[in-house]
Design a protein with these regions (language model features):
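Glycine/small-residue-rich loop that forms an oxyanion/phosphate-binding "nest" at active or ligand-binding sites
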Residues: 60-115
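Conserved N-terminal beta1-alpha1 strand-loop-helix module at the mouth
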Residues: 1-81, 122, 132-139
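Glycine-rich phosphate-binding active-site loops on the catalytic face of alpha/beta enzymes
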Residues: 92-103, 142-155, 196-219
């Protein structure tokens, strides 16, 4: 866990994965940047590695994260992702252990330590409450509590899971932020998660699988508005 992580609740994560590439990635990043400014919500934009510098230089308000890295040090390691190269490109953090890029616990520990060493914030995925508790002991900055079976389905976690996973992480380390992901596809999904107690939520296919740039950008605005609306309603009690 880096101590100067600038991300504060409420926040949202957007990951293009490999649905988008080239100018479409940049266009989505610009839409996210505008929504972050409009609603005063931090957004993690988990950027394809090759686009990190381009996205970072074109935006002001979003937090640019890499989708993966390896725990190696400068030297040999063909086609691996060097932590120092992510920092040099402008990344502020890195996502680890996504279900599409899973790590063993020993590899995850090594990767978090390397990220801490070079100053990258860490957002680590956990697909169950038990795994969230185990990951919390490694002290990442953020844990994504998303059941793998719900990813990309359009079905979000229920409120009991949201609350139980938050409690599991906070009981282990109250400084870790908790993002509730998987199956987020609309305003209501976002609102429900945030209002139920989540500090953040996020979406990939719910945004990037939409067929046009206009639809994707409109969905970004809708979801970030939901974050702000739910958070403000929660604060009012």
């Amino acid at each position: 866990m880096i101590k100067d992580c600038k991300i504060k609740p409420p926040f949202f994560e957007i990951g293009p994965k490999s649905y988008l590439f080239g100018d479409d990635v940049l266009d989505l990043a610009l839409a996210a940047d505008a929504a972050a400014e409009k609603y005063d919500v931090d957004i993690i934009f988990t950027t394809p590695v090759i686009d990190i510098r381009r996205v970072k230089e074109a935006t002001r308000r979003i937090h640019v994260f890499a989708p993966h890295m390896d725990a190696l040090r400068p030297g040999r390691g063909l086609a691996e992702i060097l932590p120092e190269s992510l920092v040099a490109a402008g990344a502020e953090g890195v996502m680890l252990n996504h279900c599409e890029k899973q790590l063993s616990m020993s590899a995850l520990r090594a990767s978090i330590l390397r990220a801490d060493e070079v100053g990258l914030a860490t957002i680590v995925c956990a697909d169950s409450i038990a795994e969230a508790e185990a990951v919390a002991k490694l002290s990442p900055n953020i844990i994504v509590a998303e059941p793998t079976e719900l990813i990309g389905t359009g079905k979000a976690s229920d409120e009991d899971y949201v609350r139980a996973s938050i409690d599991a992480v906070k009981n282990c380390n109250p400084d870790i932020l908790v993002l509730q992901g998987a199956g987020i596809k609309c305003y209501n999904d976002v609102y429900r998660n945030i209002y139920a107690g989540a500090e953040a939520t996020g979406s990939s296919s719910g945004i990037v699988a939409l067929p046009t740039r206009e639809a994707r950008n409109a969905m970004v605005d809708e979801m970030i508005r939901a974050v702000r609306d739910a958070w403000d309603a929660r604060q009012k009690g």
